[in-house]
A protein has these predicted regions:
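Short helix-to-coil transition segments within interhelical loops
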Residues: 93-98, 339
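Mechanotransmission and gating elements of multispan inner-membrane complexes involved in transport
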Residues: 196-201, 206-280
Length: 370
């Protein structure tokens, strides 16, 4: 029939427009929030527009995995709430158009959003995470975060730089307290930071002294012309040279989980995380594409429940549903890490629970006439 087809295009257009609006707003909020964390390092290394653009591109790609489903929920809630506020849904029902005709365009759009989310989750987002480490490694190699006149902590090492000239550092002081019983203090007139092909970070110091506190009665001083000092940058870059679950390509991750969980082969030291982390990450990527479908099914009956204040109502419900969904994933993930749940149960239980809630709300909305 021509009427349902026209109606479908109308509903789809409304949802798509609000989704694009939500995607712009939510992406900007998430991007600025995460970019602020890296801004100190960016400015400390010497601001460059190429660095900012690289961070924006990589962070934007990573955050899109969550921004897209939440934006679709936002679009469904606002579009349906606006239709309800303008009494358009009542008019549709008076013309004999049921819930099925209204839901079909939303389901169709949710499948498109799910396909995009799946592509992001399987390989695009992990690749962006790997690139983010490369961006930070590049910043660190130029002395990222070592702002003259300020102390910066790298693990158990406190670093102070008196001045900077290009990529070179002047007046470097290091306090290494990785061994509290034998602290080490290093003074150097100059130095540079370098990242090798394997991602190891080395601070090349020139013309300085090493002060070793061997005993409570005696201090040892060693002078040097050049001294290479390896920094522990695990907090900034993660475990160097080891495979992290969140950064692995999907095929490698699946093979790792099969080898560990199915065949029982233990992980060697080349892997940064525990076996449960790799299994949780695998099921996180597999479950991610279901979020837009669930949000679409939830958004329709929720949006039809109220007619006034559609925009504020939709924004509040969007935040609440998204928080509940992703919060439940985090909660069950913590239970799995403690050994109380298996990884598949921890990842798929929220999906099953929200699916049951969505179908119950749809059935109730259909029964009570919206």
């Amino acid at each position: 029939m021509r009427v349902p087809r026209t109606l479908g295009r109308y509903v789809a257009r409304e949802v798509a427009l609000y989704t694009l609006l939500g995607l712009c707003v939510i992406s900007a909020i998430l991007l600025m929030r995460n970019l602020a964390r890296a801004l100190d390092d960016l400015l400390g290394a010497g601001f460059a527009m190429s660095d900012l653009l690289a961070l924006l591109r990589v962070l934007g790609t990573m955050l899109l995995l969550y921004a897209l489903p939440v934006s679709f929920l936002f679009g469904v809630l606002l579009a349906v709430a606006r239709l309800a506020a303008d009494v358009e849904i009542i008019a549709m029902r008076a013309c004999g158009i049921g819930m099925r005709e209204i839901a079909l365009p939303i389901v169709a759009l949710s499948l498109v959003a799910s396909a995009l989310t799946g592509a992001l989750a399987l390989d695009v987002e992990p690749a962006a995470r790997r690139e983010l480490r490369s961006v930070f490694a590049s910043l660190v190699s130029r002395g990222a975060g070592l702002e003259p006149g300020r102390f910066r902590r790298f693990g158990d090492v406190l670093v102070y730089v008196d001045g900077r000239g290009g990529d070179r550092l002047q007046g470097v002081v290091l306090s290494d307290r990785s061994d509290p019983e034998r602290p080490v203090i290093i003074f150097a007139s100059a130095g540079t930071m370098a990242v090798d092909a394997e991602g190891s970070i080395t601070l090349a110091l020139e013309q300085g002294d090493i002060h070793l506190d061997n005993t409570s009665e005696r201090e040892v001083r060693i002078s040097f012309d050049r001294f290479d000092y390896a920094l522990d940058l695990t907090d900034l870059l993660g475990p160097d040279g080891r495979k992290r679950a969140s950064e692995m390509p999907f095929r490698d991750l699946r093979e790792t989980v099969s080898r560990v969980a199915v065949a029982g082969i233990p992980l060697h030291e080349g892997f940064a995380d525990t076996p449960i982390d790799y299994e949780l990450e695998l099921h996180r990527r597999l479950a991610a594409p279901f979020a837009p479908v669930l949000f679409g099914l939830l958004g329709l009956p929720i949006g039809m429940r109220r007619a006034r204040g559609a925009r504020a109502f939709g924004a509040l419900w969007c935040a609440g549903v998204a928080f509940a969904y992703y919060g439940s994933h985090i909660f069950f993930e913590s239970l799995a890490e403690r050994g109380l749940l298996t990884a598949p149960v921890a990842r798929w239980l929220p999906v099953a629970g929200f699916a049951a809630l969505a179908f119950w709300l749809l059935a109730r909305a259909r029964r009570v006439g919206g």
